[in-house]
Amino acid sequence: MEGKTRPSLAAVWLRELRAPFFVGTLSPAVFGAVYAHYTGVPFNWLLFALTFIGTALTNAGLNMTNDYFDHRSGDDYLTPATPVSGGSKVIQEGLLPPRQVLVAAILCLVAAAGIGLYLNFVTGGRVLLAVGAVGMFIAWFYTAPPFKLGHRSGLGELVCVLGCGPVIALGAYFVQARQFSWPAVAASLPIGILMGLVLFINEFHDVHADGAVGKRTMVVALGTGMSVPVLLAALVATYALAAVLVAAGVLPALASLVLVTLPLAGFAWLRARRFHADSARLLPANFAIIGLHFTFSAIVTIALLLS
């Protein structure tokens, strides 16, 4: 920090929270609530606001937990700092002590759990309780021992797909509709797959650091070159699944407009195929996948509102 102006405490905490990445969890939360409205359920704004806040708090807890345990493993000391990967680096730069980050993570998760318990009390049943328990488990044990879900090839990516798709969407749906819905689960899968791809392509940048500390992500297991066909297959599966959901009436016909996002998907794949081993040149592909996830999610959600 010598020769540099130390940022304000507020700026440091904003950086630690990594709020822009909340889109990955808030998108399925909004989608799930809107899907309930699409099926004829009156929209409850208060319950939606609590769902939204609880989801954001869980995401904040997850981000800070990841930073803390990646600090403990040494991973974030080795990962290159990019806009999309490598953690916040606030611990590594001495801006916050690790213990403060851990305490803040616990406080966020406790607050989220409190909101979840209240929503479960209001809505009744056990579905929301189960969804919340799964969410808390993922948020803590994604990088924390003994499970370290994100360190296990394929499992970390699958957890991201399910957690940032069906799990959150079903929870948000249940808060509004107070019943389980397989269509809501199925309809949210494309959003979850795309969020899984955001994580997956980010792993390309960290492949050497992750491998050095025993964090065996799918990209570490396959290598960046062999991971590119996986990226393509997942992109194809996303659009194919969306088409099936529209054809089956699970999503409205307007949701077919997600096809306008195909250029983003194509660009991301072509860029990854060419520059999978070049972190700096790969970055546009990362931004394309992030944009694809946001745009795709927005289109299907707006399609529900207009149908």
Q: Where do the PLM segments sit?
A:
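Topogenic membrane-insertion module of multi-pass membrane proteins
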Residues: 1-46, 50, 54, 146-151, ...
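Acidic (Asp/Glu-rich) catalytic motifs at the cytosolic membrane interface
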Residues: 57-82, 197-219
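Small-residue-rich segments of transmembrane alpha-helices in multi-pass membrane proteins
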Residues: 23-32, 158-173, 219-224, 287-300
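Functional transmembrane core segments of multi-pass inner-membrane proteins
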Residues: 159-207, 213, 225-229
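Intramembrane alpha-helical segments
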Residues: 87-179
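Extended hydrophobic alpha-helices typical of membrane-associated regions
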Residues: 247-307
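Membrane-embedded alpha-helical segments that form the functional core of polytopic membrane enzymes
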Residues: 40-66, 130-137, 182-201
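Multi-pass membrane catalytic core of lipid/isoprenoid biosynthesis enzymes
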Residues: 79-122, 219-251, 290-294
